[in-house]
Amino acid sequence: MELGNGKLPRTGLNSLNQAVHPTWGLAWTDGNRVVLTDLQLHSGEAKFGDSRVIGRFESVCGVCWAPVRTVRSPALLAIQHRKLVSVWQLCPSTAGASKWQASQTSEVRESLPILPRGCVWHPKDAVLTVLTAQGVSIFPNVHQDGSRVKVDVNTKGRVYCACWTLDGQRLVVAIDSNLHSYIWDSSQKSLHSCSFCPVFPVNCSIRSIEATGNSQVAIATELPLHKLCSLNASEALDGPPNGDDGSVHTRPVDEQVATMDMNSGVTVSPFSVPLDLTHIHFNPSQAEQSSLICLRKKDYLTGTGQDSSHLILVTFKKAITITKKVAIPGILVPDLIAFNLTAELVAVASNTCNVILIYSAAPSSMPNIQQIQLESNERPKGICFLTDRLLLIAVGKQKPSEAAFLPSSEYGQYTVRLIVREMAQGSESSGTSAESQGAYSDFTALLSKADREKFTDSLSPGSSPLSQGLLLTPNSSTQSGRSGRALIQEIKSPLSPLSSDSVVHETLHRPPWLCPALPRPSRTPEHTSTPELNSPQRENLQKEKETCPLSRELEILSRHLVAMQQYLSELTGFLHKEKRVAPAYPPSQDAPYVHLIYQNPCSVGPTERRAVLLCDGKLRLSTVQQMFGLHLVEMLHEVLSSIPSNHMVTHNLHGPGGLFWSV
């Protein structure tokens, strides 16, 4: 569905966040108008209906619906302007069923510009949260009065985004690289900091956040470019195990969280000493030199696994905070995120990249299960899940003239349209379902167990499983033996064919066709409260986890290998067709150029003298013809009686306009 041209923010925007209402449909803006479009689902397909303009304004940055309280209660729509938020009430008109009326109920003004995602509704009540770069305010009764609850941020950092947990009891605010957690008292209409974890450091700038549970949020962090040049050499690099191997060996630390004093909240960064990389020489192994296509283990040159942006699940418990991290390949600033509770899917995208990645938010693993590719000149300006199968995407397309130059403002002109993409059949969070198993049974039957083990060993020889999560306990100072420092325990997973984080390598080190991350099975960590299975069930579960994802990986890998083989054959053909000329450097006694002198007997003026370079000791007559503007050039073959002492040779050439010779 085409929405037309609009003026939208270039970054940090999710125009479809809280934009769908079950009764009133989809609310959207083109920068000046606020439009409602009917949206209905029939047989698993989205159908767009008529559109109605409810208002025209000087500037509109975004719109979002308040949660549905009761069927007959009026719907509240927050319209975000630059420094103003107006709340409108929509209800059916008494004149007729097809009539409706909209009226403004309240208005919120801020001294600073409101963030692109600066309006966040409470999931259960008509409580509006307004974000600026330096503050957060809560309006408990925004549709009745303008009473404000100021959030005590207690820091000078920049606010990027915020969200409520699904139960509405916790507000999580992302400030720079920290998560600030607050508890909401709905009866007293007050907010206070979390007692056990008021500030949780992530060590990377947080660009987007979305609630995934009653006590869990998903955050997306950007690529920390400023930290790649300030890694600690002692923590990043390990020496070679023997003298024969000169390649770089690094410690497989995939996830690292800055140590935190739970009492004082002071963050101690381990990145202080600069790393000198000038002495490092990379020597490929013999297997890599002989193989046509070589799949290597992840390059741990950056030491801490911070060579890409990350998707992190943070769970707030009463006495524990758990994080799970997975890399986001190819997206530097992931400022778009959406979540579907039924399918446990997380969609991650960026306003500056044409790729949308779908991850499974299952407790045991977070594999990248699908990638949506837009056109090269298209950018996602909003994403949201309509159902567990359908993802609604607002696609913005810039003019070629605007895309060719650096942006001069925070806003740009886009041609916006809506598209719906269906999730893949294998996108269920349960990797052991019967449907997933049957979908790849034919392919798996072709592989014996020995072949699968051999293929797995060839992909990652000697590799150990990477961390799937971090366990941070408040009473860890007594366990670690260090006062004031928290214990960071790596949660190991069983051996698997491919690690989700090791396969998801940065696109700077990989060809584009190998960018999608391959799914990997994983087992629930031991610290979780999962009921213990008996031995036969555990064996069957392990077999299913080994077979289904491995067949999926092999199928994707086979397609990539076929495509790579085609590219290599085309490249070989180009090399054979190319005519290679290895010109020999002329001897010092031979001049690589000649002097051409042209004399016209009909003209009284001076002769023309030009120096012309020779190509392999030859000069084309057509070049001479074009140089002097002749219609015809004829070469006379003569027998030279003698050669001058200076080894110069004279050739007489006759043309229709006179005589010229080369010396």
Swiss-Prot record:
Q: Which domain of life is it from?
A: Eukaryota
Provide the positions where the record notes the PTM N-acetylmethionine.
1
| UniProt cross-references to InterPro entries, sorted A to Z | WDCP
- Region (Disordered) residue ranges read 454-483, 514-546
Annotated Polar residues bias: 473-482, 527-539
Residues modified to Phosphoserine: 291, 460, 493
* Interaction with HCK: annotated span: 533-538
Q: Which UniProt keywords apply?
A: Acetylation, Coiled coil, Phosphoprotein, Repeat, WD repeat
Q: Which residues form a coiled coil?
A: 549-577
Posttranslational modification = Phosphorylated on Tyr when associated with HCK.
WD repeat ranges are 55-98, 154-194
Indicate yes or no for the key word Acetylation.
yes
Q: Please identify the protein, giving its name as recorded.
A: WD repeat and coiled-coil-containing protein
